[in-house]
């Protein structure tokens, strides 16, 4: 079982090296940078919703619903944090 896992890990490692060697390194690097930025944004996420969320109903706008940290007001349907 451990040998299969090691073979799988090594295969993925060598395929990633080959991807870089085949001239796709630039694309691979850009994908890695984008993933790094996304993770950075998730770690340092804003605590307040964007200003326009005060005028939108949370449940109808996915981005506002995401930033609505205190939840949606059940009476108005808008963010309680704004």
UniProtKB/Swiss-Prot annotation:
Top-level taxon: Eukaryota
This protein's record includes keyword tRNA processing: no
Signal peptide range in chain numbering: 1-23
Propeptide residues according to the Swiss-Prot or TrEMBL record: 24-46
GO molecular function: toxin activity
Tissue expression remark: Expressed by the venom duct.
Modification sites for 4-carboxyglutamate: 60, 63
Annotated disulfide bonds: 53-68, 58-72, 64-79
UniProt modified residues of type 4-hydroxyproline: 49-50
A single Gene Ontology CC term: extracellular region
Keywords per UniProt: Disulfide bond, Gamma-carboxyglutamic acid, Hydroxylation, Secreted, Signal, Toxin
InterPro entries in the record: Toxin_Pg (IPR026210)
UniProt similarity note: Belongs to the Pg turripeptide superfamily.
Domain notes: The cysteine framework is IX (C-C-C-C-C-C).
Protein name: Turripeptide Gsg9.1
Protein's organism: Gemmula sogodensis
């Amino acid at each position: 079982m451990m040998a299969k896992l090691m073979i799988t890990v090594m295969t993925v490692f060598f395929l990633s090296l080959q991807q870089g060697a085949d001239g796709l390194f630039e694309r691979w690097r850009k994908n890695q940078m984008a993933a790094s930025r996304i993770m950075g944004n998730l770690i340092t996420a804003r605590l307040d919703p964007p200003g326009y969320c005060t005028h939108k109903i949370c449940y109808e706008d996915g981005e506002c619903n995401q930033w609505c940290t205190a939840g949606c007001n059940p009476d108005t349907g808008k963010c309680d944090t704004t």
